[in-house]
């Protein structure tokens, strides 16, 4: 199983990814986490340090793949999770998608890519250009990390569009949303009510999760010293169990930007304005909850072309 984790920059994707990787390992799976961010800090809480990147290693070997061994690029992390950092090109030059491709190519040449039960790609921010959408080429499921905020759901909606596009040519499905650092979930619920998709879990705003990142450890590692944190780990184990059940997943249909603005802004408006916002969206997407039929291309085109007046 191959998973690609996306979401708005700073939303906590790496924290979710590391804890989810350990949760999957605790369920008996052999897990590899691949960081796909030029900052190369995805696996920091698993290994305790910034591991050398694939690009660093390739450069040191003058790109002679035959001189590279698995131990040169794969590092053991906490809980038996193996870790790889793809790295990235110099700032302002090159393409991150090329780096992801080179990483997969190298792992295949090392006969490592198919040795794992689960490979998890932790991907840079909400960038969904052709380059950083590259992990979707290899993934079975996409997971989108969001919170209950306006900007995070806008980013999630753009990622949904990328999943829909990639699913046309790849066996990719959206597994669902993961709410992170979320005290309330009204906007998340409003979004999935119109654009139907699973919500795998909603993690509340828990200070211990933030502190764990600062300490360079996962919740599961801190749990060994503080048993009272065990209940927090259950959130990640729940997500792992849902994924290991191999859900059917969905090919989602994103909302047009203006529709999404109208939908989410209606949360802060009067009842009369909210009713107007919903009627505008229903005019294009049909009854609420039917807006994500990926098969209805005509409806999709209408949604893209229709212009709504901001309230």
Swiss-Prot record:
Query: Which residues bind ATP per the record?
Result: 10-15, 39, 180-181
- Principal localization reads plastid
Question: For this protein, what is the EC number?
Answer: 1.3.7.7
Recorded catalytic activity of this chain's protein: chlorophyllide a + oxidized 2[4Fe-4S]-[ferredoxin] + 2 ADP + 2 phosphate = protochlorophyllide a + reduced 2[4Fe-4S]-[ferredoxin] + 2 ATP + 2 H2O
Any GO CC annotation of this UniProt entry? chloroplast
Subunit architecture: Homodimer. Protochlorophyllide reductase is composed of three subunits; ChlL, ChlN and ChlB.
- UniProt cross-references to HAMAP family, sorted A to Z: ChlL_BchL
Kindly list the positions annotated as binding Mg(2+): 14
Q: What is this protein's function per UniProt?
A: Component of the dark-operative protochlorophyllide reductase (DPOR) that uses Mg-ATP and reduced ferredoxin to reduce ring D of protochlorophyllide (Pchlide) to form chlorophyllide a (Chlide). This reaction is light-independent. The L component serves as a unique electron donor to the NB-component of the complex, and binds Mg-ATP.
Which residues bind [4Fe-4S] cluster per the record? 95, 129
Family classification? Belongs to the NifH/BchL/ChlL family.
Query: Keyword set for this entry?
Result: 4Fe-4S, ATP-binding, Chlorophyll biosynthesis, Chloroplast, Iron, Iron-sulfur, Magnesium, Metal-binding, Nucleotide-binding, Oxidoreductase, Photosynthesis, Plastid
Q: How is the cofactor bound?
A: Binds 1 [4Fe-4S] cluster per dimer.
The record's section on InterPro entries has: NifH/chlL_CS, NifH/frxC, P-loop_NTPase, Protochlorophyllide_ATP-bd
List the NCBIfam families: DPOR_bchL (TIGR01281)
Matching Pfam families, A to Z?
A: Fer4_NifH
Q: Which cofactors are named for this entry?
A: [4Fe-4S] cluster
In which organism is this protein found? Answer: Oltmannsiellopsis viridis (Marine flagellate)
Q: In which pathway does it act?
A: Porphyrin-containing compound metabolism; chlorophyll biosynthesis (light-independent)
By what name is this protein known?
Light-independent protochlorophyllide reductase iron-sulfur ATP-binding protein
Q: Which GO terms describe its biological process?
A: light-independent chlorophyll biosynthetic process; photosynthesis, dark reaction
In Gene Ontology terms, what is one molecular function of this protein? oxidoreductase activity, acting on the CH-CH group of donors, iron-sulfur protein as acceptor
